[in-house]
């Protein structure tokens, strides 16, 4: 289970995984996330991104070898397809959903590790770009850093590096008072 690995272990393993398997990775940066979050919930965003990644990967691989698509279930299959709206889901007949899929199938564990590695790399990129040592999670250090960014850059600055609907934002606002 990839959840039992440290970030350092994941960052060491992922380059090897990427050499061995085809994959597609889509990143939704905080600023765009905050924009989309105004009209779509998290599961809807995830469904749309999953579907796009699946369609792009399908174009890259030998379709004759594809036996199934397994999605780490983050919402019910009926909601997943409802969230897609008018987007096509060409692999629906062979798409399966599994809760905690990373514990049951190596492909989902690999995808989970690639996603975590991308998240960590994204934090590094945003840290360099905006000049703050960005942190993840929900703790006092994160709240204090968000408050510092808010004081120096305003809400527009925080919007570029944080998901504004998280509780950390209100805590950061409270700390600026």
Residue ranges and their predicted role:
Residues 1-177:
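RNase H-like, Mg2+-dependent phosphodiesterase core
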């Amino acid at each position: 289970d990839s959840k039992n690995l440290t970030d350092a272990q994941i960052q060491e393993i992922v380059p090897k995984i990427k050499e061995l398997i085809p994959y597609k990775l889509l990143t939704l940066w905080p600023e765009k996330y905050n924009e989309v979050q105004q009209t779509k919930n998290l599961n809807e965003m995830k469904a749309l991104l999953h579907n796009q990644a699946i369609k792009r990967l399908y174009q890259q691989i030998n379709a004759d070898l594809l036996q199934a698509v397994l999605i780490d279930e983050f919402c019910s299959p009926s909601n997943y397809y409802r969230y897609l709206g008018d987007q096509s889901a060409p692999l629906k007949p062979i798409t399966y959903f599994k809760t905690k899929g990373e514990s049951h199938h190596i492909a989902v564990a690999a995808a989970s590790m690639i996603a975590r590695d991308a998240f960590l790399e994204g934090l590094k990129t945003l840290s360099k770009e905006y000049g703050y040592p960005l942190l993840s999670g929900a703790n006092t250090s994160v709240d204090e850093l968000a408050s510092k960014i808010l004081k120096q850059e305003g809400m527009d600055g925080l919007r570029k590096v944080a998901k504004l609907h998280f509780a950390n934002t209100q805590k950061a606002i409270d700390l600026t008072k």
